[in-house]
């Protein structure tokens, strides 16, 4: 769950010293290259948050690494810990719901809505747009339905 509604993550990204398959943030700049990601929360579903990210730099796994750094790994991202229930209840019903969501979207939930670049020879701007894939839309619908059913009862627990 991302705490702030929007913000900027700045930190050097380089190969993790403990796991060569992962990248990591190095706050002190001792490793890696400078990386900047701006994020904005689009929707909240309890402990799951839909976030939009805009990159100033293009480092390997930048969004995945910066979101993990915030304590919000990408949904179902097994490399960076998003395939585990990190927060919230561990009751069987909730666990089964999450497992069903993992099955509905059997990959990390990262989608490039738009990509753009300047052609190196012509200087022409290129921009490509893409809609959110159906499996990710399905998971969002599931969370919307689940949290709508659970939220009215939240006050009764407190």
Spell out what each predicted region is.
Residues 1-158:
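RNA pseudouridine synthases
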């Amino acid at each position: 769950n991302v705490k702030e509604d929007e913000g900027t993550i700045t930190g050097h990204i380089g190969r993790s010293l403990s796991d060569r398959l992962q990248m990591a943030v190095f706050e002190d700049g001792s490793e890696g290259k400078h990386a900047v990601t701006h994020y904005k929360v689009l929707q909240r579903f309890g402990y799951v948050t839909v976030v939009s990210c805009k990159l100033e730099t293009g480092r390997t796994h930048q969004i995945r690494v910066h979101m993990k750094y915030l304590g919000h790994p990408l949904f179902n991202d097994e490399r960076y810990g998003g395939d585990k229930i990190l927060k919230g209840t561990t009751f069987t019903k909730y666990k089964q719901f999450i497992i069903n969501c993992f099955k509905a979207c059997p990959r990390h939930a990262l989608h490039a809505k738009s990509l753009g670049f300047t052609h190196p020879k012509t200087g022409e701007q290129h921009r490509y747009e893409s809609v959110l894939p159906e499996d990710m839309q399905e998971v969002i619908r599931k969370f919307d339905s689940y949290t709508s059913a659970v939220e009215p009862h939240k006050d009764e627990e407190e």
